[in-house]
Regions:
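Cytochrome P450
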Residues: 1-395
């Protein structure tokens, strides 16, 4: 039976060999840390689409483990809710992220990308994460929400602490991470409370003003839900894209043949981004709790036990993807689940796709001599979000 430490730096740097061992030897694996690990595509999709696997108990599960009350907003956003509340909250913001609306943002996204590359070109090198992958989606989501982009340094630290808290259920009870994550949520809630007060007095044509209007219209959205939704949109609105651009660029630079193919075939970019999402996706796992006993792969998962469907493992499952460890930008029938599946499918997927396509396409065209400065870039210590701390490149 294969065992693994989910927070081991070596595993986090390259989890895929471990995923393959688990999938082969113990695909429904019960960890000594008291949670279930699913690594087969079929099982992961089954859980994500099964209404018996729910999310609302997760906040209380973590709070009980650490003996702390859930911080403000935890359990109140659509990410943490089950129907009917999930349906109501998602409906309030879904119109802002439709493919049609996102297509209207292409020109602005291209403008931001061109500006960031122009700034880096003179230097001949950059940290691709800090100077390109991060500022692009932050600029875009700030403009959509109506958040002053000059405040991004303030919420960058909060965002990092909040996302570190996503792995709280895996940490020892003495860990300070949940408390730090809670403090960041408090700070970000206070920040948005101030912005909400400003927009109540002077509404604008931004998403924040639209959410406030919905809240003021009746019982569609409470103030606590409004603040939780703002935090979710700001954090999730850039984290996925940062990691898509960073992981995707690294994969291309490590596969020069595929990089050359992309440069020679610009029309390949949409297919390329889908393959990059599958090959080394920005979100590696999610979590659910069954509302009743459920049998998967011959093993019974008890009501109330934590289940972790590993998206990153499912997207390398040879039963679904032939030759799954090969990067193939022309891969067909690429039904990856990098953005999830079912009712919690990533609301911002159309935006992340367009940002990723424009960023990577422009990067490889404008910087034909782009290359890595180090062969061993450092990864963030996160099981949930797979992303690089830095990615030094030169050109």
């Amino acid at each position: 039976m294969t065992s693994f430490n989910p927070m081991d730096p070596e595993f986090l740097a390259d989890p895929y060999p471990t995923y393959h061992r688990l999938r082969s030897d113990d695909p429904v694996h019960h960890s000594p840390l008291d949670f279930w690990v699913l690594t087969r595509y079929e099982d992961v999709v089954a859980v994500l689409r099964d209404p018996r696997f729910i999310k609302e108990p997760l906040a209380a599960f973590v709070a009980a483990r650490f003996g702390v009350a859930p911080p403000p907003g935890v359990g109140l956003s659509m990410l943490d809710r089950d129907p009917p509340d999930h349906t109501r909250l998602r409906g309030l913001v879904s119109k802002a992220f439709t493919p049609r609306v996102v297509e209207g943002l292409r020109a602005r996204i291209q403008q931001v990308v061109d500006s960031l590359i122009a700034r880096a070109e003179a230097a001949g090198s950059m940290d691709l994460i800090e100077e390109f992958a991060y500022p692009l989606p932050v600029n875009v989501i700030c403009e959509m929400l109506g958040v002053p982009v000059e405040d991004h340094e303030r919420f960058k630290g909060w965002s990092l602490d909040i996302t570190r808290g996503l792995d709280s259920s895996l940490l020892p009870p003495e860990s300070e991470v949940p408390r730090q994550s809670g403090a960041a949520r408090h700070a970000m809630s206070d920040y948005f409370r101030g912005l909400v007060a400003e927009r109540r007095a002077s509404p604008r044509g931004d998403l924040l003003s639209a959410l406030i209007a919905a809240e003021e219209a009746g019982d569609k959205l409470s103030e606590d839900e409004l603040l939780a939704t703002c935090i979710l949109l700001l954090v999730a609105g850039h984290e996925t894209t940062v990691n898509l651009i960073g992981n995707g660029t690294l994969a291309l630079l490590r596969h020069p043949g595929e990089l050359r193919r992309l440069r020679e075939t610009p029309g390949l970019i949409a297919s390329a981004v889908e393959e990059l999402l599958r090959y080394d996706g920005p979100v590696q796992r999610t979590a659910r709790i069954p509302s009743t006993d459920v049998t998967i792969g011959g093993r019974t998962i008890g009501k109330g036990e934590m289940v972790m469907p590993f998206i990153g493992a499912a997207d390398r499952d040879p039963a679904q993807f032939p030759d799954p460890d090969r990067l193939d930008l022309t891969r067909t029938d690429n039904r990856h689940i990098a953005f999830g599946w079912g009712i919690h499918f990533c609301l911002g997927a159309p935006l992340a796709r367009v940002e990723g396509q424009i960023a990577i396409d422009t990067l490889v065209r404008r910087l034909p001599k782009l290359e890595l400065v180090t062969d061993e870039p450092e990864y963030r210590q996160s099981l949930t979000l797979r992303g690089l701390k830095t990615l030094p490149v030169k050109f």
